[in-house]
């Protein structure tokens, strides 16, 4: 929050960023939604502003280390010799666990948490297919999967019991967060409703 309050330029990840996060921006700050920008435009704007002595805040959703697509941005800033700092955030994974009042690891249930996403526009190695990861029967936190929930459920049912408890959390930690609880057997229908 302190960086956002001082930043001259803020580039945020569109609808994924809670508007309350940006509410502390100083008057006169230049604010851009990166959803309408490509990577080259984003990194060029960041580098040019930083080189002009401006404080730049690149605001991602949750924690930038999980599906934040920051590797390319870091590489570009390094190549331009632009100093930067990565400030950790609260991942929607942990905000969801808090909203669910759930512990992700429980003795004799699961001591492992798998963080993944379904294959989509971003390719993914076959060895990381959800049905392959399901074989571990660990706690699974699946990002970006609600739009293909029936396919995700079908892959999970390869190894999980249909009565396995499941929750889908939308906009974790936001004022308008939504939680849908069910089992693997009925979650796809519950999400549709």
Residue ranges and their predicted role:
Residues 5, 63-136, 178-185:
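Class I SAM-dependent methyltransferase SAM-binding "motif I" and its flanking Rossmann-like core
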Residues 51-56, 112, 120, 124-193:
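A contiguous loop/helix-start segment that scaffolds small-molecule binding in enzyme catalytic cores
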Residues 23, 48, 105-106, 131-132, ...:
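Short secondary-structure boundary/capping segments
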Residues 25, 80, 109, 160-162:
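Short, structurally constrained coil/turn elements
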Residues 13-14, 35-36, 118-119, 143-147:
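Structural motif
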Residues 1-90, 95, 188:
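Class I S-adenosyl-L-methionine
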């Amino acid at each position: 929050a302190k960086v956002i309050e001082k930043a001259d330029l803020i580039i945020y990840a569109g609808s994924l960023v809670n508007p309350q996060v940006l509410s502390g921006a100083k008057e006169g700050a230049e604010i851009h939604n990166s959803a309408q920008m490509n990577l080259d435009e984003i990194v060029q704007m960041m580098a040019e502003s930083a080189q002009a002595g401006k404080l730049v805040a690149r605001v991602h959703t949750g924690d930038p280390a999980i599906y934040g697509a920051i590797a390319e941005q870091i590489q570009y800033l390094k190549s331009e010799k632009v100093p930067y700092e990565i400030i950790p955030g609260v991942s929607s994974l942990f905000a969801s666990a808090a909203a669910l009042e759930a512990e992700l690891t429980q003795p004799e249930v699961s001591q492992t948490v798998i963080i993944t996403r379904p294959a989509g526009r971003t390719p993914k190695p076959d060895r990381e297919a959800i049905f392959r990861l399901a074989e571990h029967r660990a706690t699974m936190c699946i990002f970006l999967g609600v739009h293909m929930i029936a396919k995700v459920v079908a892959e999970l049912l390869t190894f999980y019991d249909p009565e396995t408890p499941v929750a889908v959390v939308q906009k974790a930690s936001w004022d308008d967060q939504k939680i849908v609880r069910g089992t693997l057997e009925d979650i796809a229908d519950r999400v549709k409703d």
